[in-house]
Amino acid sequence: MKKKCLILFKWPNYLNKYLISKLSNFYEVEHLFISNYKNENFSQTVDKINSTIEYKKIEIVFFDVDFAKFMNFFFINRIKKVKKVMVTYDDYAVHEMNAITANSCDIILCQCPLSTLKYREKGYESYWMPPENDANIFKNYNLNKEIDVLFFGQLRNDRKKFIDFLIDNGIKVKIVGHESNWATEEELIKLISKSKIVLNFSKSLGETVTNYAAADIYKFHYQLKGRLIQSGLCGTLCISEYSPGQEMIFNEKEIPMFRTQDECLEIVNRYLSNNELLKKHSNHFSSKMLELYEEKVNFKPIYKAIDQPTFKKVELVAIPYWYVRIAAKQIIKKNISIWNMLSSFSQLKQVLKVLEKSSIYVQLLVTIETILNILWYSIKSIKSKN
């Protein structure tokens, strides 16, 4: 009999279905969205989730934490009597915050193997889990390879410059997923199957890399992208911009990597001009993906780890001021309005619990800011309704 698990998503997202599908192979799965708890304050949200866990006899909860500042260390600690698994897809951007949130969980699952090592370095039990690696969804249709180069995704930042450079040098590139040129999931998978090469870019897409601890510092990071996994499962070679995550699991023959436009053009031309080389490396890449990284293979050690009775814990010396400040603000902002200001003030005791192990200086600063936030966001709620 399958154990029951609950996925606590922050809000609806296209990646959610992959996690639901993945876990359904191993567990009886329920899911909730934090964004649906619009009329509940912090305490009420926690109580409702705990009631659901008890009523449905949930044994494991998976927390979708990226950019969900409400779903932090203090919130997760209030979820009782279950094994807790943190899931992160964008850890490159929010690792400093996630690494503290992780302390409230038993297992950490990362989209990138580099992030997995970062958590292990701190003593956490962490595993690599790509979201889009289900061979029942992403499969090779064995179609005629009539598309030279396929790119699917948004043409932001310098992606367009790379693609324009290829086109200007005589390479035929099919672009899907930009502006109105969309395809269904099934259409996209068939397009990948009929392509000789899938082109992947690794730079993050935001204007800067989010930094909750201070001002943003970096313009981008090099990420491991899902296109690599999808391409391999569909039997197509992926040529990719460099990222350290993919370098950890693939070599140059499995995924040729470039950094510059000239390197990209040279690699594309090398494979398009040599069908035997293209076929050989495509087959090797696809075989490795299916044998080592396909969903059922990849998740087995994770399932075994979650099933263990006890977990090692990492001791935090302190939780930094910036993190405590964010957590306190999230407690107060939950369902705040001028009409329920008294309820918001009642949540001050939850903020004081957050501050229990902080210095007197931090307690004073955060308490004063919390009172001001209650007043400010209550007044602001009137303006937003007018």
What residue ranges belong to the model's regions?
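P-loop/Walker A phosphate-binding loop and immediately adjacent motor/lid segment at beta-alpha junctions
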Residues: 76, 121-134, 214-215, 234-236
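Local beta-strand N-terminus motif with an aromatic residue
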Residues: 57-58, 105, 147, 195, ...
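Generic beta-sheet signal
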Residues: 87-89, 111, 129, 152, ...
